[in-house]
Regions:
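Active-site donor-binding segments of glycosyltransferases and PAPS-dependent sulfotransferases
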Residues: 29-101
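Membrane-proximal helix-turn-helix segments that form the acceptor-binding/catalytic region
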Residues: 131-162, 170
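Conserved donor-binding/catalytic core segment of Leloir-type glycosyltransferases
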Residues: 194-214, 220-228, 232-234
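Nucleotide-activated donor-binding/catalytic signature segment of Leloir-type glycosyltransferases, i.e.
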Residues: 241-265
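Acidic donor-binding loop of glycosyltransferase active sites
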Residues: 269-281, 294
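Short hydrophobic beta-strand element within catalytic cores of glycosyltransferases
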Residues: 295-299, 308
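Conserved acidic donor-binding segment of nucleotide-sugar-dependent glycosyltransferases
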Residues: 310-311, 315-322, 330-337
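A charged, aromatic-enriched C-terminal amphipathic alpha-helix characteristic of glycosyltransferases
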Residues: 320, 333-372
């Protein structure tokens, strides 16, 4: 069986890339051809996720500093994706949070899309992106978004089966595309993120990619107002340029930038709690933290409502404000969550083994129905 696998792009070893790796593990490496708009994986991630397999790319691969500026190429991404020739395959699987489902293929080839989210800048987060764009209030920006919405809906009609990464995204797929979908939660490395008998230390942790929507800067500002509480921040990304200034003069806040997986896991295992303030559609890192038996303080939004048991594995706070973060910290101080076994138990329902079985069963059933 010839399989094509399509990803928006490969530039960081994040949640979407971990899903890609778990799907690719299901199929014979030699039977799968991988497509992406560009591939700038570091060598370690290339071996972990792609097992060293090459990726067919677009001209964006040759744009200098593409990892930092790729979002500015959104207007041409649909056109570039359509230039991939995905003919002659028995099965096409895409994992998309942007344009990966927009390729052209034989209509008689089964097309399955694992959707992380409909394209955020033109749907649920349109107002946020427009407010931050210098032309966000212009007629041209509005016209461009309308064009992308029409293209996005049209490309969704070429998908035979949608898989949603959460109930939250299932609802958004229905709202944006008018399509039904099946929920299969992403795979979480619950074996790698293990419970540890090490003594918990008196610090809070904020970890992840440093991009604006993660709101890590807001968490830092919250702890600037709590000088008696220690915060450790781990992560890199194009949004980190202001972090040095934010933590200056705050001895209770430490920003470590990049750390290896081994170091990061140790920090998670020893933390009092980990804080997640982003609007996440699922949030794999939040589940990885719970797999270590560490409680989380997370925004009451999206995937966190499905992955956090409020009052058992963490506390949900209502709004993206510094005060809400501070209130959540105070609540944990007054009502500690120390049943680390129960916290880990909650994470085990999102294991990689569970994902591979659910995904394989879904594809097999879809192929039987489609090719009967």
């Amino acid at each position: 069986m010839k399989v094509a696998f399509v990803q928006d792009w490969f530039n960081a070893n994040g949640g979407a890339e971990k899903v890609a790796g778990a799907i690719l593990d299901i199929y014979d490496k030699d039977a799968v051809t991988i497509y992406a708009l560009f591939d700038r994986f570091p060598p370690s991630a290339r071996m972990e996720i792609l097992k060293g397999k090459p990726v067919k790319v677009s001209v964006l691969q040759y744009v200098p500093f593409i990892c930092k500026i790729y979002r500015y190429f959104l207007p041409v991404m649909p056109w570039l994706m359509k230039r991939f020739n995905l003919k002659g395959y028995d099965l096409i699987i895409s994992t998309s949070h942007a344009v990966a489902k927009g390729f052209r293929s034989d209509p008689g080839t089964l097309n399955i899309c694992y959707c992380h989210t409909p394209l955020r800048p033109i749907w649920d987060m349109y107002d946020d992106y427009a407010a931050s764009h210098p032309m966000g209030k212009s007629f041209l920006y509005s016209a461009f978004v309308n064009y992308l919405r029409k293209w996005d809906v049209a490309s969704s009609k070429r998908v035979h089966y949608f898989i949603a990464n959460s109930i939250h995204i299932q609802q958004r797929i229905k709202k944006s595309y008018g399509r039904e979908s099946t929920v299969i939660y992403p795979p979480v490395r619950v074996d790698k993120f293990a419970l540890n008998d090490a003594e918990r230390k008196d610090y809070y942790l904020c970890v992840g990619r440093v991009v604006p929507y993660k709101k890590m800067d807001m968490v830092i500002r919250a702890f600037r107002q709590m000088p008696d509480k220690k915060l450790i921040v781990i992560g890199t990304g194009w949004g980190a340029k202001d972090f040095n200034e934010l933590v200056k003069g705050c001895p209770n806040i430490e920003w470590y930038g990049y750390r290896s997986d081994e170091d990061m896991i140790r920090y998670i295992q020893e933390a009092r709690a980990c804080i997640f303030a982003a609007k996440e559609d699922f949030g794999i890192m939040c589940v990885e933290v719970q797999a270590c038996g560490t409680p989380v303080l997370a925004l009451d939004y999206g995937g966190y409502r499905e992955t956090v048991i409020d009052g058992v594995s963490g506390y949900l706070f209502p709004e993206q404000t510094e005060q809400c973060v501070a209130d959540a910290v105070t609540k944990l101080e007054q009502q500690p969550l120390n049943n680390h076994i129960a916290i880990r138990q909650n994470a085990l329902r999102f294991s990689e083994e569970r994902f591979r079985k659910e995904f394989s069963d879904f594809v097999q059933n879809a192929m039987k129905t489609f090719y009967k």
